[in-house]
A protein has these predicted regions:
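The feature marks the mature, well-folded catalytic cores of soluble enzymes
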Residues: 1-291
Length: 291
């Protein structure tokens, strides 16, 4: 309903003004009509479903903002929302680099036919994830920015549905000054994006989704470099809100403002309590109805 849309916008506006009061500059992208069909010579998509999270398409490393390839057809044109802001940054800052990865064709060759069929049970899906057998093929480089975490000169990239090995290789070749490490999380039957799975909180501390633990051999990279990985607290909810396309583990997708301050969704009391005990100042943010 229109009223609830106004309410949802108000929640985002409140979050934005809270950040601004703390001295953080907040830029808001220009929304498109996400309901419109899109097409290329290779395919047609009925809507631009999912084209709203800036975190998913823009990868910021140093003075560069890179537009990711994206791997959903409906999100192919998502970058258009951010072009006005990117143009502004480019004009205002002589050192800003605006880059774009090669746009993938996303033909049928990019996807395994029937991979997402309802006939396939959860055990088989978990086995596939463990074997790194995903819905996307290695036809061409694919990656979403939301699969990447930056730790100084190290980029940690989740290999899963939305990022393939060719995409990780492309990032390695592109970021010559960085070390790129592939990670995967066998407990997730639908591995899309790293943010509700593996979250750095402050230097030396990462929270990891206990249902999707980083495999033992991959933990060494972090532990050998002084990073402790602990299980994230349980979510406060048993299911996501209506029409929400994310899991209940959005509870751990927090916003770290500085090494001592973190924003947590206000209903996620267990996650807030855990971060409080870890010495963080927790800012509760009312955002669940805007997911």
């Amino acid at each position: 309903s229109a009223a609830s849309d106004v309410y949802k916008r108000q929640l985002l506006d409140n979050f934005s003004s809270m950040l601004e009061k703390r001295g953080i500059k907040v830029d808001r992208p220009t929304p498109l009509d996400f309901n419109q069909p899109t097409s290329t010579p290779d395919w047609k998509a009925e809507t631009m479903f999912g084209c709203m999270p800036p975190r998913d398409v823009l990868l910021t490393v140093g003075n560069e903002i890179l537009e990711a390839t994206m791997s959903y057809r409906c999100r192919w044109f998502e970058y258009l929302c951010y072009r006005p802001l990117l143009k502004q940054y480019y004009n205002e800052d002589p050192n800003m680099r605006h880059e774009s990865a090669p746009k993938p064709r996303l033909t049928d060759a990019d996807y395994r036919k029937d991979y997402l069929s309802d006939k396939i049970g959860i055990q088989k899906r978990l086995k596939w994830t463990e074997d790194k057998f995903f819905v996307t093929t290695e036809e061409e480089p694919l990656f979403d920015a939301a699969d990447v975490l930056r730790f100084g000169k190290d980029l940690v990239v989740q290999h899963g549905f939305t990022t393939n090995l060719k995409g990780i290789d492309w990032l390695k070749r592109h970021y010559k000054d960085h070390r790129v490490h592939a990670v995967n999380f066998p407990g997730d039957p639908y591995p899309i994006h790293i943010d509700a799975t593996f979250t750095p909180i402050k230097e030396g501390l990462i929270i990891n989704n206990p249902q999707r633990r980083l495999p033992k051999e991959q933990r060494k990279l972090f532990e050998n470099n002084g990073w402790e990985i602990i299980d994230a607290a349980q979510p406060a909810h048993n299911e996501p809100p209506p029409l929400c396309y994310s899991s209940v583990w959005l509870s751990m997708n927090v916003l770290v403002i500085d090494p001592k301050t973190v924003c947590v969704e206000k209903s996620e009391k267990y996650q807030a309590e855990q971060l409080d005990k870890l010495g963080m100042e927790v800012i509760p943010v009312d955002l669940r109805d805007a997911y």
